[in-house]
From Swiss-Prot:
GO terms for cellular component: cytoplasm; nuclear speck; nucleus; THO complex part of transcription export complex. Residues 1416-1425 have a biased composition (Polar residues). It comes from Plecturocebus moloch. Residues 1-163 are annotated as: Anchor domain. This is THO complex subunit 2.
Amino acid sequence: MAAAAVVVPAEWIKNWEKSGRGEFLHLCRILSENKSHDSSTYRDFQQALYELSYHVIKGNLKHEQASNVLNDISEFREDMPSILADVFCILDIETNCLEEKSKRDYFTQLVLACLYLVSDTVLKERLDPETLESLGLIKQSQQFNQKSVKIKTKLFYKQQKFNLLREENEGYAKLIAELGQDLSGSITSDLILENIKSLIGCFNLDPNRVLDVILEVFECRPEHDDFFISLLESYMSMCEPQTLCHILGFKFKFYQEPNGETPSSLYRVAAVLLQFNLIDLDDLYVHLLPADNCIMDEHKREIAEAKQIVRKLTMVVLSSEKMDDREKEKEKEEEKVEKPPDNQKLGLLEALLKIGDWQHAQNIMDQMPPYYAASHKLIALAICKLIHITIEPLYRRVGVPKGAKGSPVNALQNKRAPKQAESFEDLRRDVFNMFCYLGPHLSHDPILFAKVVRIGKSFMKEFQSDGSKQEDKEKTEVILSCLLSITDQVLLPSLSLMDCNACMSEELWGMFKTFPYQHRYRLYGQWKNETYNSHPLLVKVKAQTIDRAKYIMKRLTKENVKPSGRQIGKLSHSNPTILFDYILSQIQKYDNLIIPVVDSLKYLTSLNYDVLAYCIIEALANPEKERMKHDDTTISSWLQSLASFCGAVFRKYPIDLAGLLQYVANQLKAGKSFDLLILKEVVQKMAGIEITEEMTMEQLEAMTGGEQLKAEGGYFGQIRNTKKSSQRLKDALLDHDLALPLCLLMAQQRNGVIFQEGGEKHLKLVGKLYDQCHDTLVQFGGFLASNLSTEDYIKRVPSIDVLCNEFHTPHDAAFFLSRPMYAHHISSKYDELKKSEKGSKQQHKVHKYITSCEMVMAPVHEAVVSLHVSKVWDDISPQFYATFWSLTMYDLAVPHTSYEREVNKLKVQMKAIDDNQEMPPNKKKKEKERCTALQDKLLEEEKKQMEHVQRVLQRLKLEKDNWLLAKSTKNETITKFLQLCIFPRCIFSAIDAVYCARFVELVHQQKTPNFSTLLCYDRVFSDIIYTVASCTENEASRYGRFLCCMLETVTRWHSDRATYEKECGNYPGFLTILRATGFDGGNKADQLDYENFRHVVHKWHYKLTKASVHCLETGEYTHIRNILIVLTKILPWYPKVLNLGQALERRVHKICQEEKEKRPDLYALAMGYSGQLKSRKSYMIPENEFHHKDPSPRNAVASVQNGPGCGPSPSSTGSTSKSDESSAEETDKSRERSQCGVKAVNKASSTTPKGNSSNGNSGSNSNKAVKENDKEKGKEKEKEKKEKTPATTPEARILGKDGKEKPKEERPNKDEKARETKERTPKSDKEKEKFKKEEKVKDEKFKTTVPNAESKSSQEREREKEPSRERDIAKEMKSKENVKGGEKTPVSGSLKSPVPRSDIPEPEREQKRRKIDTHPSPSHSSTVKDSLIELKESSAKLYINHTPPPLSKSKEREMDKKDLDKSRERSREREKKDEKDRKERKRDHSNSDREVPPDLTKRRKEENGTMGVSKHKSESPCESPYPNEKDKEKNKSKSSGKEKGSDSFKSEKMDKISSGGKKESRHDKEKIEKKEKRDSSGGKEEKKQYPFHLDVFSQYNGKL
């Protein structure tokens, strides 16, 4: 009562006299209107009286006031005294419990005040005797209690005395005879009841005993239950309702002995009486045993025992003896199982279920723990039988398979039994509820299991095809929810308890495959993680399954796959989740189990395969597992093992892929790319598409062919029979619309790996994740392109502008996805046009192909415009951009070699089949047919590709004129081409790398206007440091392949003059004059000749060496790794020059030593490359054989060295005359400013070794002299240069020789300035800043300009220069004499053109030396000091004027003769001096023990032809010694007599060299060279240092 809502507010009590009393009376009046005792108003009235009385007890209200108001209320109800007595009774108990004297006193006063309202009799009945005594209503409570006991005993326990001996025999005999007669006639229960009444009255029978006899007869005659029920109903109307229940309870008590067994007839009678409501279940339930708390204890004990068994099974057993002990314990436990004690509640429950009284049975089961009742087999079978009966009509209608008859189940005759289900809607009434109580114990009735599954399958078919109204849909949704619940709670747990029933598993899959994978996986998750903990039996089953799985897995090997597989299959039919969870845990630990496990899974059911897919996903999504190893640089081995297992198992078995694919997509949405490894493996195994960077060139070549060639020769492993598995993968992607989303997510995640996912991760891991993401995208896109039909592909992939602008897909990925669509589109259009005109000529076919291309690609050309800013399209056209990105290697070339190779393999295979005598004839025939069919397919595919390539080339030939617009310079065009086309695509895939190189070659071969091949190659090779440093590991590999293909082309041109002349000689791509206009010209003089091209190639090789050494010296992990990968890829074509190879070899050897302990992966890479490099050493050649170095005109070479576009005019190419020294100064500027200029690698070599201090002094003296000479010359020629006007050629007018802008006074107008800036060779930002500073310094010191050919004639200029030349020569002679010891002055290994050291001021010259000389080398330090004098003189003689005046041939010859005569005289004088010094040194050496000076050793080696390998090797390409000086001197001496132009000069020179290289023996050559050295005058002084130390391939064709 105290917990009820407050009826009397406290405010009423406070204001009792004013308003509270009236409010209370009003409330009581309202509550008294309903006189019923069952209504809520009655309870509220009691509550009001209670609260009023309680306020009196608390002292809030006086008892007089309460008694007065109670007196007024007594008029409202007649039962007021009884209600008030009940209130007093409750308050009496409460005040007794409180033990507070004040409240007890208040209570006593209140009751005394109300004695006139409640009679004494009522109070004595309700109140406690002690309270009555305190009120004075009784004298002593003790006496009152004794009297009460006596009266109760007399009333309730004193029995009436009957004469049993006389009356019982006859009376009860007649009663039994009456009840046992034949009841089939017209006898009714009313008639029998009247007879029973007569017997009771006649024989004075006890009515209770009569009732007991009736029940006994009812037990014996259960078939007449209708008769006895009506009889008992009539009989009980004369008795108290509880009598029948007490008698039944007494009967049940009788059997509650230790070994007693209650008869089933008694259970049935009780069940029937309950069903007809003759007794109440609650009244009978208390008479039954065991008690509920005992049942609960038993349930807990069973769970504890099950857990104990689990602990025993999971214990580690170390010996076989312990195993035997465990088996003995199991046997003992089985023997200990005794007959369970009689459970009357379960017996009654079974009887209720048998007669169909579901409501009472449900009430009993609700009193027990979950599934406790159903865990008893009899109960479970009774529920199953009831369900059989209930679902029979529905099952007959929808569940019986076609052709099956089945055995019908008869319905219960009991009208009170549950109604049978006629429709799916009827299942909700009782059937689903019954299943919920049955739980996992449906396992006792497999037939019912199958029936339910079939009904569920029929419902799902109807549900999926239902197009009814909304109301019906809502109903079916509810039924579906119930069906899923039943599956979760009943079907799957029951399957776990069945003993390896494969049929039930397959039957269940029939229903499961109609569920979406989301529903299935939720059910599997519940089954695996929740179900096994809900029941003791399932706990035991789980433990036993794990124990058995351990036993099998310990013994699983490749040899016993079949028997072990059968055991695994048997175990998996019932408990797949537990089994697979354990197997996957073992695979994650031991990857060598993958293959045996995959092979052993062939005995699984379809349901088991689906469960396996779920278990794999759950294992992948395990949040407790780290996806990285402890070093945080590599992906965990467990993930790699799972990925490998996934690929193998999904390929081999028909497993649904939707869940796995969606999981990967979800991970990508969440920004996690680790699990792409799974997708990569699945696509590789199922579709046979392999992505690897270790592909051989043969495989790459095969990948450029058709699909058949790719499958046969493009992959490492011949993955056959992928048709079915790839079809399954395709169906899964299309059915769930995951094809495009996965592509887009992967394309976007590439950047996400770097900017979102890679924040705290190691750079190595980020690179691996990026590569994994990218490789999977390429692999997945390739799968879609080769497997999806044209319609499917086009329908799913949007246009290129939508992909890039709306989906934010990177351009390379967007074109990668769109490329197959364009090919499909063009092919289909072409086929349509061909069909329209059959039998047309080849020309018409090409025309139709071009038309179809235009129709398909025109919208693409418009779409790509939006991808870049409008300025981009000034350099390249959208058509060219789209053409580049839409074509593939398949379109450009036919891999005839690969086709031939694969066809030959098949022929060999067929021959082997013929030779095999053991093979059965039938198999032989099949294999031969297969090989023949493959051969025919390959040949047909090759023919088809040939036709296709021809059509594509025709199309490109027509398009090429519109590709590159002449709106801007070629330099900018090449920049955009590389930036937007080549570089993004060459690192996209290995085949794309090859494509990019071949495309550049194709554009060159097509003679595309405005395309400079030379500039393109130069930009690619000049500085690869930044590109290499920014690559991931796989990108570096692809970039290396790209460079390899580019080098292959360059090497082919370099190695043979005829090839070069044929493929490059008259091509616009090799023009050295780059004009701003679109005119490419056909002037032969504009072309780069063969020898100069070889110089350029050497420059490129040097640049590659320099970049490689720089990367190797950084110490950065990615720099070193990437450059080693690139070097490994380009090893077939680089290095070719011996000194460059040696520089690389030393640096790589150093890496091997440094990284052996620190970074083993780099050590392994370096060791691998080092070994390969050593094996290639025999193919390397000296530098002088790589490119021919002679005093031929160098204008074209210098122009290329300084970058195409900043070279001289054509007329300067053939000139052999020299300009004044300002030309040398400006050439130095151009070399320093150009993009192709050599960057510093190291500054260490600028210091001079201590051992050569005397040389250093002489060098410094020489430097001072040179510096003074510089200043004088600068002053004398400043005026002369200012007066000269710009040169005649366009480039000379726009640019100086250094490729930079002229000073303001030399620029005619702003237009020329604008043109000049466009034609400038592109540089990096750092180089620009550096060159600007140098330009300012030089302009202040020299203010040199290009001489104008028109202002003065060459003769006049020569006369002006003659005095200054003589002064220069005199100074050189003095400085030469200062050099003691007869040291020879080899030229330093710089790649720059020969700059006279004397022309450079001392600080600047020192700075340049520091930049060039990167490593301190004894041999090199001497060359640096002595080369100043030689370079000064040689530069005065041999420097070429870039803009010569138009002199006549006779004048040129005269000038040449004068120069050469003077130089001969000076050289002869020096040679005599040198010979004298040499003899003195030999004499000194023989007489003393002094060391041979290193320069003398060097000279001797040169004289003996061993200059290529010196004792002190340079440590970088910058220090490479000047190779084979003898050839230079020979050529110089021979060239002194020549009086021809540059072309004849070159050809004669080449003839001399080639004849010398081929015919003369080494010994003869050495003698001749020594003689020529003695005879030559000024040989040393006339030595030239070319801008490139380049290899000439024509000299060593035979060696390669």
